[in-house]
């Protein structure tokens, strides 16, 4: 929620600056508003799902080194998924992929393939979801205002996270107040 609270005045400041320069980034038509809401929903839901998978994976197996490496696989996965969208890959991409997969093997396969833990799968799914989120932002950002997209995205993450917390945890009002700042 903190990001939402920061982005609201940021949008207002950017709007004021743009008005002075004679431009306006506000969505004017219903179609533009719908596109912004859809972009915020898609990007926000992917970000929420990736963050949730990461947090659950770390809860199951709190090896931060492994979690960091598996999560960082999104750096390799984004260009790989980009290949499916018609983007070209360089030789460096393929070398990086091989090195990353070797590192993944050394980190996760201590006792053969069966040694992959459920937390590893969650953290790999986190990397995939972060990759999709980055690709979604790349897709939508030329179509909508970036600051408004960030606001919509973080609003979706905040709402979905709050709903998940209420469904799967038993937070007290004091905990909400304590974590609000």
Residue ranges: model-predicted function:
Residues 11, 15, 74-95:
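C-terminal transmembrane-helix exit sites in multi-pass transporters
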Residues 44, 48-52, 75-80, 105, ...:
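Hydrophobic/small/kink-forming positions within alpha-helical transmembrane segments
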Residues 16-20, 25-65, 70, 106:
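Specific transmembrane alpha-helical segments of multi-pass solute transporters/efflux pumps
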Residues 35-42, 89-101, 120-123, 144-154:
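Cytoplasmic-side transmembrane-helix entry/capping segments in multi-pass membrane proteins
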Residues 1-4, 25-28, 58-66, 132-157, ...:
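Juxtamembrane helix-loop-helix junctions in multi-pass membrane proteins
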Residues 8, 89-109, 126, 130, ...:
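Hydrophobic transmembrane alpha-helices of multi-pass small-molecule transport proteins
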Residues 1, 31-36, 94, 109-129, ...:
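Juxtamembrane helix-entry segments on the extracytoplasmic side of multipass membrane proteins
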Residues 7-12, 78-79, 84, 115-171:
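Transmembrane alpha-helical segments that form core, pore/gating elements
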């Amino acid at each position: 929620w903190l990001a939402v609270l920061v982005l609201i005045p940021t949008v207002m400041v950017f709007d004021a600056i743009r008005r002075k320069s004679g431009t306006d980034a506000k969505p004017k038509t219903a179609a533009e508003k719908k596109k912004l809401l859809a972009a915020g929903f898609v990007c926000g839901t992917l970000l929420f799902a990736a963050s949730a998978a990461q947090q659950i994976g770390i809860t199951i197996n709190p090896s931060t080194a492994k979690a960091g490496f598996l999560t960082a696989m999104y750096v390799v996965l984004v260009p790989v998924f980009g290949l499916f969208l018609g983007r070209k890959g360089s030789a460096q991409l393929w070398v990086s992929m091989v090195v990353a997969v070797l590192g993944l093997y050394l980190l996760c396969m201590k006792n053969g393939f069966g040694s992959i833990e459920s937390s590893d799968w969650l953290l790999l799914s986190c990397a995939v979801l972060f990759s999709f989120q980055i690709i979604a932002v790349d897709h939508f950002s030329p179509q909508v205002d970036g600051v408004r997209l960030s606001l919509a995205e973080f609003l979706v993450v905040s709402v979905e996270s709050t709903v998940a917390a209420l469904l799967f945890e038993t937070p007290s009002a004091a905990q909400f107040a304590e974590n609000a700042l």
